[in-house]
C-alpha cells in the first residue's frame, strides 16, 4: 500500500503506439492494484485515442477508466504538482511544473525504455541531483531482479499447460515498415499447411497490398494466395490484442508494449526493436537475445530469425528452419514466461521505490 497517493505521469507520444501503450497500462495498474490517484498528461490526445478508445480528444480534461487525463500543452495549468511525478522516456517536464514540484517537494522518477543491456543494472535507480534542489531518479525496466521489472498485471493468467500443436498456423503481424513482409509472405504461401495471418491495421498495409498486387487494402479485407491467408483487423484495444497474442502460434511484435505482451502470452515471437541511429537498436536486440535465450539449445535459430527480420531481408531457408523448431521454441518461451513471472512486477517495484526515496 502506498503512502504517496497522488501521482502524475507525463507522456509524449513519439510513434503513436509504444509510448502511450506503456503509459496507459502502467496508469491503470497503479490505480487498480495500488489504489493511487493517477493523472496522465498526454501531448497528443488524438494519437492516444487509438490506445484509449473512449478518449475524447477534443476535451482537455476528462476521466477514462477512473484515470484522470489532461491535454499537455502550453495552456495546461501546472500550478500544482503531484507527490510523485513520473517523467516517461525522458519526455521533459515544463519549467512551470518543475517550479511547482519544488514547492511540493515531489518525488521525481524518469521511467526509461525497456532494455536487456547489461549496463541497465548499474544505472537503475541512480539519482541525479538538479540545480533546483530536486533529485531526478532513473528507473529502468528490465528482465532481472536488479532492474525495475516488467509491466505485469495480476489479472494475467498463467497456466502449466502449453497449447497442443495444430496443422494450421496462426500468426499475428505487428511490425514497422522496414520489415521484409514480401519475403515473409513469399515463404508463408508455400508452407505445407494453411497459414492464417492476422494484421491489426497500421502503416504496413500498403506493403501487404503490394504483395497481393492490389491498389489498397482496408480493415475487414481477406486476401489469399496458395496456403497464405491474410485478414486485416481493426487496430485492437489492448485487451483484444493481448487475447490475439495468446490465440496465435507465432507473434511478430515491435517496440516495447507488444514485445512484453508477447512474452506474457508464452508463444513464439519475433521482436522488431524501434529503429535508432548508428544501429543502437541492433545492440538492444542482441542484448535481449543473449539474455532471454542464453540457455536455449536452439538459440541460433531464434537469433537468426530476429536479425533477418530486423535487418529487412529474410532468406527462404529461415522460415523452414524456424518452423521445424517451433514446438521446442514454444516450450522454452513458455518456461521463460513462468520464470519471469516469479519476479516482482514493474508497478509494484516502482511504488515501493517512490515511497522509499
Map each language-model feature to its residues.
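A donor-sugar binding/catalytic signature common to diverse glycosyltransferases
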Residues: 8, 12, 16-17, 24-28, ...
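Extreme N-terminal starter segment of soluble prokaryotic enzymes
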Residues: 2-8
